[in-house]
Amino acid sequence: MMAKKPPKPAPRRIFQERLKITALPLYFEGFLLVKRSDHQEYKHYWTELRGTTLFFYTDKKSTIYVGKLDIIDLVCLTGQHSTEKNCAKFTLVLPKEEVHVKTENTESGEEWRGFILTVTELTVPQHVSLLPGQVIRLHEVLEREKKRRIETDQLPLMPPEKEKEPVQDYADVLNPLPECFYAVSRKEATAMLEKNPSWGNMILRPGSDSKNYSITIRQEIEMPRIKHFKVTRTGNNYTIELEKPVTLPNLFSVIDYFVKETRGNLRPFIHSADDNFGQDPNIEDRSEKFKKNPHNA
């Protein structure tokens, strides 16, 4: 059964972790029963609306989401008649699927509808039954979302060019590249880590396919070992190809994942501008071109 009392906000530590992982502002949260197109039954999630994405957690205390739903292309939100007492039902109609949602009570159902329509339509809906204070919150969220989209250059997005150089696959205007990114080969990355271990032991570099990324690390457990991990771009996210793949929202989160999972044993490889690599002097120039202007690098 769903909770009858309004849930309390997540503790500050959990909030900060989720903010860091999702890299999106929190607009609304609460319990939802969700049925995706590939599910037969509803699943119970603690749900957060961040930006124009719904993040699903197994419970209030989880910091890692188990699923997410991008609703920026929402076609419409349709209400459903519910035979269950104190329960609101509606459907999120998206271009490629329909997602059925149930809320814990009719009031929270109106709030969810209000916030979802506000961030997707960029206007406060007039046909929701909310209290004055709740409507004020919608206007505040509307201004925050407009500002966020302007800052991330998402309003509007220009269609991609038909022809482009392979190097443009590294363009990440919305998420600048981490400091430990270097436009080097696997061999060069290995040499950098071996020659300058005091600067760090983890490098982010272009993948061998010129479309994705790779991470090269140097670990010293008994004896130095070099390992390479492929990081594949999947839509707006990045997937680390491990035994159990891990998907994260940006490259900064990818680096943070390795640092946290090794309890700080892996550190980003960062050098001073005054230091000398002792290798190809063009490496630094190439990396800066990728970071500042990847289209022309």
From Swiss-Prot:
The keyword Phosphoprotein applies. Phosphorylated on tyrosine by TEC. Phosphorylated on tyrosine by KIT. InterPro entries: PH-like_dom_sf, PH_domain, SH2, SH2_dom_sf, STAP1/STAP2, STAP1_SH2. It is found in: Nucleus; Cytoplasm; Mitochondrion. Residues 25-121 form the PH domain. The modification Phosphotyrosine is found at residue 170. May function as an adapter molecule downstream of KIT in the proliferation or differentiation of hematopoietic stem cells. Interacts with URI1; the interaction is phosphorylation-dependent occurs in a growth-dependent manner. Interacts with KIT and CSF1R. Keywords: Cytoplasm, Mitochondrion, Nucleus, Phosphoprotein, SH2 domain. It comes from Mus musculus (Mouse). Residues 271-297 are annotated as: Disordered. GO terms for molecular function: macrophage colony-stimulating factor receptor binding; phosphotyrosine residue binding; protein tyrosine kinase activator activity; protein-macromolecule adaptor activity; receptor tyrosine kinase binding; transmembrane receptor protein tyrosine kinase adaptor activity. Residues 179-273 form the SH2 domain. One of its GO terms (cellular component) is cytosol. Expression restricted to the bone marrow. The keyword Nucleus applies. GO terms for biological process: cell surface receptor protein tyrosine kinase signaling pathway; cellular response to lipopolysaccharide; myeloid cell differentiation; negative regulation of macrophage chemotaxis; negative regulation of macrophage colony-stimulating factor signaling pathway; negative regulation of microglial cell migration; negative regulation of ruffle assembly; positive regulation of B cell receptor signaling pathway. The lineage of its organism: Eukaryota, Metazoa, Chordata, Craniata, Vertebrata. This is Signal-transducing adaptor protein 1.
